[in-house]
């Protein structure tokens, strides 16, 4: 609550999951899949204790996915289907989840850096005109607030987008921010493709969720890709079973590390971009020479796609190799002094929400210079809102 007794709500609209709750809390009050489903055939009224409705959102949609045609309203951190996104927000603010009266609430929304302005403008319009929130703030780089750091590099990879954002003394350096539109959802798609090559067919919209769960359970990042490839070819060490919802059992071998490898080698899915290690190295090396060592010592991982076992050690190995080759030109004596620290907090899946909860709590009473009020929106329109956020409309 702020000093006027208004609730301060934080919503992290992820491409894969919505995390929502209150300012100053240590964990989201609700986490549910950002998906909307409609029944393929209206035959039954109930399945177990879930009533089948014309429109299903969130967990119920995920549980009954075999009977539904499923849509994901967001892609790469950008809302592609505003009607379906509206259903997700109705679910978020309605009696099923937060159960709030928006007119009495302040709302902090999150978004990935380098998102198009049009997406942000439409978000403001919907929140003020459709829901009537009292005041709103939209923030991009929130992870460091959760870690209590003022300087560092955030490597955030969720379901829709991966980005690397350096923050110095509390200011995000937008000119150095790097964005890669490869994240969890692309890994799931690639895993579906790899399984298809083995003869397992997952082409129904509901199978996507099944493969996502399989990916979370079994995939990992290879420390040494060549060694893992040899193991996959010559032994059964990597082979693991997975039971599908219909009871069938499938085996995964090399696919377990091949799917997430696209983070480091985007060319595997025909994307001509640098991989994660290259992007991070390029981002830090492009920063001011005085800040680089600070950045190397404070690399913070955030988002669900950074949860793969082996990711921090692989990132560290490749960063060190790049630094040795390109900066020190193979001088191993100087390399001894080079220090890297990659922080992988256990709660990093919800890091953006936690940072938002910290920021919203700090700023809850700063109406003049922080929150954009409904009155300001009505008087000055979207240009006024953007100006207050420090964004050129």
Curated annotation (Swiss-Prot):
Keywords: Actin-binding, ATP-binding, Cytoplasm, Cytoskeleton, Nucleotide-binding. GO terms for biological process: Arp2/3 complex-mediated actin nucleation. It comes from the Eukaryota. GO terms for cellular component: Arp2/3 protein complex; cell cortex. SMART domains: ACTIN (SM00268). InterPro entries: Actin, Actin/actin-like_CS, Actin_CS, ATPase_NBD. CDD domains: ASKHA_NBD_Arp2. Pfam families: Actin (PF00022). Belongs to the actin family. ARP2 subfamily. Component of the Arp2/3 complex. This is Actin-related protein 2. It comes from Caenorhabditis briggsae.
């Amino acid at each position: 609550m702020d000093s006027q007794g208004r609730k301060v709500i934080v919503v992290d609209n992820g491409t894969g999951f919505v995390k929502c709750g209150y300012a100053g809390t240590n964990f989201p009050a609700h986490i549910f899949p950002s998906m909307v489903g409609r029944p393929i055939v209206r035959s039954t009224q109930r399945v177990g204790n879930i009533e089948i409705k014309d429109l299903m959102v969130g967990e119920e949609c995920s549980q009954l996915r075999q009977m539904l045609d499923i849509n994901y309203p967001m892609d790469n951190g950008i809302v592609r289907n505003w009607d379906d996104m509206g259903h997700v927000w109705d679910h978020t603010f309605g009696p099923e989840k937060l159960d709030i009266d928006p007119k009495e609430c302040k709302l902090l929304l999150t978004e990935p850096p380098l998102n198009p302005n049009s997406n942000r403008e439409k978000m403001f319009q919907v929140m003020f005109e459709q829901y009537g929130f009292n005041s709103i703030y939209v923030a991009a780089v929130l992870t460091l607030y959760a870690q209590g750091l003022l300087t560092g590099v955030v490597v955030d990879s969720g379901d829709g987008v991966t980005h690397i954002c350096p923050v110095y003394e509390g200011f995000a350096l937008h000119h150095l921010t790097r964005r890669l539109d490869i994240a969890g959802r692309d890994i799931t798609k690639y895993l579906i493709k790899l399984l298809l090559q083995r003869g397992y067919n997952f082409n129904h919209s509901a199978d996507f969720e099944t493969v996502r769960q399989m990916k979370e359970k079994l995939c990992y990042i290879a420390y040494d890709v060549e060694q893992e490839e040899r193991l996959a070819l010559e032994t059964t060490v990597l082979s693991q079973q997975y039971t599908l919802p219909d009871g069938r059992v499938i085996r995964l071998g090399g696919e377990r590390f091949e799917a997430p490898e696209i983070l480091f080698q985007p060319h595997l899915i025909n994307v001509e971009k640098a991989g994660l290690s290259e992007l991070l190295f390029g981002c830090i090396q492009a920063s001011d020479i005085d800040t680089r060592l600070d950045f190397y010592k404070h690399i913070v991982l955030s988002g669900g796609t950074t949860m793969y076992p082996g990711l921090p050690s692989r990132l560290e190995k490749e960063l060190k190799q790049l630094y040795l080759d390109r900066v020190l030109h193979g001088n191993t004596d100087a390399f001894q002094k080079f220090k890297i620290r990659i922080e992988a907090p256990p709660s990093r899946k919800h890091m953006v929400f936690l940072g938002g909860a910290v920021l919203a709590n700090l700023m809850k009473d700063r109406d003049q210079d922080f929150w954009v009020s409904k009155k300001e929106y009505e008087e000055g329109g979207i240009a006024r809102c953007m100006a207050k956020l420090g964004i050129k409309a």
